[in-house]
Amino acid sequence: MTAIDPHIMKQINCFIQTLAPLHPQAAYRIAVVEAYNTQKHVFKGMFLVQAPYYLVLSAKDHPFAAVNAGYVMEQLVLYLVSKGFATCYLGDAKSKPDLDQYQPMIVVAFGKAAATAVKKPASRKKLTELVNQPPVAQQNVRKIIEAARIAPSAFNLQPWRFMPQDGKIHIFMKKESLMQTKRMKELTLLDMGIAMCHMALAAEELWLDWRLSREDTSNEPIWKGCQYVATLYYEI
């Protein structure tokens, strides 16, 4: 496994400092773990991959810690991919707790790709399966939802659902079985953060004024079988 040039690693660390959180009050840390000098797995768990480097995001306990972790980490993953690095989310990787009550949330393996990879098109739900009232007529709204539609998710569950309205898109998470494990619930919330990162970047590329927030509890939209997560407001 190949080490990354120190100058490039410095750029990566500098980019980490510029990440924009979804919930600023949800404290988190990102550590870069070097493993290019070992052939052993650095983490425990299932579905692991060996890589020269790993990103470990740890967060303090907060109602929106998992959503925020996904939102922040996906910014970093997309940055690394744009620079030619290969990345892989390790949903089951187990890391030791950080200091000061920070708990590991998600691990991402990354490094220089061994060869130019040709990725097969991922299986995704149709856009009409993800919105409450298809079709989506407004072009910008369709592009924003499409950006979320192609986002990665644990076990490709694609838990996101969308309710477009004038000037806003309500974002929902499909409710899963009551037997769902605590970690699986956490991964689903991480997935929602990843999808919202894609939506935010799409809105930015469309030159829209936008913000992500939540409706007041008394005014939360309702979708049977789904849980309200957030709303993306936009102005053209």
Regions found by a protein language model. Give the residues of each.
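Acidic, surface-exposed loops and disordered segments
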Residues: M1-I236
